[in-house]
Design a protein with these regions (language model features):
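Short, solvent-exposed helix-to-loop capping segments enriched in aromatics
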Residues: 37, 98-110
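Short, hydrophobic/aromatic-rich segments at coil-to-beta transitions
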Residues: 40-46, 61-68, 117-122, 140-147
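A generic structural motif
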Residues: 48-50, 68-70, 85-87, 124-126, ...
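Bacterial N-terminal signal peptides that target proteins for export
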Residues: 1-9, 19
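N-terminal leader/targeting segments and the immediate start of mature chains
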Residues: 19-53, 60-62, 72, 167, ...
Length: 193
């Protein structure tokens, strides 16, 4: 599951002495981007993870997500349960989302340092799962690139293209059930490595 989890990190943000003004400007601009994403009823986009793995991500408010990768793996959430499914191993992770803040706002919140240069945001923190996040947005404040760097230097980069917003997405897409023959791992994100 560990190798699969960084790919979930779908959807790159962005600091010192000139700090307070940069941080406030960066936070304000970042909040505007998060507000834009939160205002969308739905979206669909093509994604490329680390320059290789491709897929399609679909989102419907509130908190419904479905990602189908080119290798058959699926990440899906109806807002209450998050599934990770790998058809090669027939293993499915089932994560209870009760009490979890999600979305772009959840990923980008709590960073001590936020700076912005043009359309590139940089967020840094020594206490977060990702020590650095870079977010590049388009002219209409939709994500183009999200790069997340952990303290062990592992980097996950997600590039978005062909984003379509406020499209009709049926609820059934987000009610994923793995094949009955799958091995289910309960709450894999709560387990210690």
């Amino acid at each position: 599951m560990r190798n699969f989890l960084p790919k979930f990190s779908i959807v790159l943000l962005f600091s010192v002495q000139t700090g307070i003004l940069w941080a406030e400007d960066g936070r304000d601009r970042l909040n505007a981007v998060i507000g834009k994403m939160n205002s969308l009823e739905s979206f669909r986009a093509s994604v490329t993870v680390n320059g290789g793995l491709t897929g399609v991500v679909s989102y419907k408010s509130p908190n419904q997500l479905h990602v189908r990768f080119s290798d058959g793996r699926i990440i899906s959430s109806n807002g209450r349960i998050l599934w990770f499914y790998n058809p090669d191993s027939s293993i499915a992770g089932k994560q209870d989302l009760k009490g979890v803040s999600g979305g772009l706002g959840g990923l980008l919140s709590g960073y001590e340092n936020v700076s912005v240069s043009g359309r590139t945001f940089r967020l840094t923190s020594n206490t977060k799962r990702y020590n650095e996040i870079i977010l590049v947005v388009s002219d209409n404040d939709l994500p183009r690139v999200l790069k997340m760097k952990r303290s062990d230097e592992e980097i996950t980069e997600v590039a978005f293209s062909g984003i379509a917003t406020n499209i009709g997405l049926g609820t059934g897409l987000f009610n994923f059930q793995p094949p009955t023959s799958s091995q289910i791992v309960e709450n894999p994100l709560n387990q210690k490595e």
